[in-house]
């Protein structure tokens, strides 16, 4: 399996980097101050697929995604609404978790919150001060960027270029690039009850230190994969790498992986442009798995253009895959109820599995993997009424497993075989239809419907599914 490493700017073989069959993975979560948007959804869904594929390959994945529950934006909203930092953060964490459930994103192994790790953060900062990488000014603690010689390597920017960035201007800092590890309490922090005791006075942690602390606590250093959106490369991940490298003296992360943006009418989605699309709003019009499917239709390192037309195309494509799986399952239930048929032509399931894996091994190329699934669905539809029970089961298990790598159709219930009594009623209904006794045929159909079973008439006889 090959993955693009942002640090090296190269495609690298995962097997050459990961030790054994255990992968440790950290992905930056949301800052919980507002409803989450489809940019958050893209990152969450992609890294969920990354995790699922690693598990498909036989790896045990320890997956950590944090919640930033104390931050300037959270505090500003809390003050504006007359609430505490905790009240604001907990509300939007809860909303985010609802969105993730709708998108069928698996729960991470750990979901730590910043406020639960204040002692760990203080200890980490103290270590950086002792090693000469950080300094204290009037209750604030800053990381001194020039003390870390590898700064800029992740974002591929020189120190001269970085001097031109606006980075927390403060004339007290030793260098314009220095960034906050700990912020002394301000009036807004006190109003929002977002202050914590520390050796440097009451205050709260800076943004970047949080992820260094929590990734090290739950995964150790070094760990295998660090993920996030492309917008986090600088300054967040650059600063995070500097902190962790300075603290532990080793490259903290083996592979840095970043997904690209979602665009609205050719522009990056952002609050400043007023073009934010919230997950919850899309979910009012589309099933969660349709949105999930859409988010996987572009390669993760390419921008994804969001339009209603694109979502409608995704819906139709998703339903094509789903109907193939349902039809196959109905056929399996039919064969179990009314008896097997002789094997038809041999079906090469392994070819589809191989090509799906080739696509995913090629830097998680989900569009190509989806294309293989559509070919597979075409085969299912073409051969549906020629399969033996064994062949149908083999196709079902293979197709369902590959779709599961993308997080699709996992909650779909199997179509049951009918009892002998119900099978006789189906035969009676088919006879009634042939005799044009539609009143009896409809009565039998309605009786099944009352029990949640929908009878479906096909050119090859009656099939059914549970509603």
Swiss-Prot record:
Binding site for ATP: 271
Gene (UniProt): cysS
Motif 'HIGH' region per record, residues: 30-40
GO function terms (MF aspect): ATP binding; cysteine-tRNA ligase activity; zinc ion binding
One of the protein's GO biological processes: cysteinyl-tRNA aminoacylation
GO cellular component, one term: cytoplasm
Known EC number: 6.1.1.16
Cofactor: Zn(2+)
Keyword match Transport: no
Disulfide bonds: none
Compartments, as annotated in UniProt: Cytoplasm
SUPFAM superfamilies assigned to the protein according to its UniProt record, in alphabetical order: Anticodon-binding domain of a subclass of class I aminoacyl-tRNA synthetases, Nucleotidylyl transferase
Residues where Zn(2+) binds: 28, 211, 236, 240
Family from the record: Belongs to the class-I aminoacyl-tRNA synthetase family.
Catalyzed chemical reaction(s): tRNA(Cys) + L-cysteine + ATP = L-cysteinyl-tRNA(Cys) + AMP + diphosphate
Pfam families referenced in this protein's UniProt entry, alphabetically: DALR_2, tRNA-synt_1e
Cofactor: binding comment: Binds 1 zinc ion per subunit.
Identification of the protein by name: Cysteine--tRNA ligase
PANTHER family the UniProt entry points to: CYSTEINE--TRNA LIGASE, CYTOPLASMIC, CYSTEINYL-TRNA SYNTHETASE
Superkingdom assignment: Archaea
Keywords recorded for this protein, A-Z: Aminoacyl-tRNA synthetase, ATP-binding, Cytoplasm, Ligase, Metal-binding, Nucleotide-binding, Protein biosynthesis, Zinc
InterPro entries per record: Cys-tRNA-ligase (IPR015803), Cys-tRNA-synt_Ia_DALR (IPR015273), Cys-tRNA/MSH_ligase (IPR024909), Rossmann-like_a/b/a_fold (IPR014729), tRNA-synt_1_cat_dom (IPR032678), tRNAsynth_Ia_anticodon-bd (IPR009080)
Positions of short motif 'KMSKS' region: 268-272
